[in-house]
Regions:
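N-terminal nucleophile
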Residues: 2-266
Length: 266
């Protein structure tokens, strides 16, 4: 389970689509009682993101300069250590930096032990980088489709395989149609992100938590009495702007949409 308000599953196409360098969908899972602010332009900062009001950080964000970042937590129920720095500040640190994505990741690697386990993607218009402080050195990503949840990207859980299949076989073909209604596109995103299909027990990962909890967390969309998918996101970078739709999935604002368009600075 998340302790920092991080994303819990993300799929994106990087320089796969014409005139759309980045197309990303994701779910943020969190305890319902943990306070957070929805997607917004941060005051006196270049960041557009939601915000974890407990730690002050965020799970995913962009800037008008074309920088973007997203973090998922690396789940390890056996790790009982206390860490001095919140993973939620990684996004803000990158978005407010002028460093190239690979350089930022390489510098972060020097003090990565200060954080609980994470998967981190940082990028701009030309370069995307992945790293994990639990066994994946910073690597520049080739053009392609990437999916990660709460294990290493190289582990490829059945949960991530299922999302990759739906993202590549159902969603990307819609995007590649010459004429597609925005409503149809967005409906396809929510249908994929609200998938409650569970993985059968023998195919579950072992992350140091109970089998019952592994099963609960094995679906793209999670619901339980105290923890679950708090919001879903559909983010696109075109040649001249960001288009971001966030859907609140739990609580009093359930079903509420926030849609932002952020022009890119040349």
């Amino acid at each position: 389970m998340s302790e920092t308000g991080s994303m819990c599953i993300v799929a994106f196409a990087w320089h796969v689509l014409d005139e759309m360098p980045l197309c990303l969908i994701s779910n943020r899972d969190e305890f319902y009682h943990r306070p957070s602010a929805p997607l917004h332009q941060w005051e006196n900062r270049p960041i557009v993101a939601g915000q974890d009001l407990q730690s002050g950080g965020t799970w995913m964000g962009v800037t008008a300069a074309g920088r973007w970042a997203i973090v998922t937590n690396f789940r390890n129920g056996r790790d009982k250590n206390q860490y001095s720095t919140s993973r939620g500040h990684l996004i803000q640190d990158f978005l407010e930096s002028d460093l190239a994505p690979i350089r930022f990741a390489q510098m972060l690697e020097q003090n990565q032990q200060d954080y609980a386990g994470f998967n981190l993607f940082v990028g701009d218009r030309e370069q995307a980088v992945y790293m994990s402080n639990r066994g994946e050195a910073p690597q520049v990503l080739a053009n392609g489709v990437y999916v990660v949840s709460n294990g290493l990207m190289s582990e490829d859980w059945h949960k991530t395989r299922h999302l990759r299949k739906r993202f590549t076989q159902e969603f990307l073909p819609i995007l590649q149609q010459p004429q597609v209604a925005e409503l149809d596109l967005v409906s396809a995103v929510w249908d994929i992100l609200e998938d409650e299909r569970k993985i059968i027990p023998k195919l579950l990962p072992d992350t140091g938590i109970s089998q019952e909890m592994e099963a609960l967390l094995s679906s793209t969309f999670i619901q339980s009495p105290i923890y679950g998918t708090r919001c879903s996101n559909f983010l696109r970078m075109t040649t001249d702007q960001w288009q971001w739709i966030e859907k609140t999935q739990q609580g009093e604002q359930q079903g509420k949409f926030i849609e932002l368009t952020i022009p890119l600075v040349k």
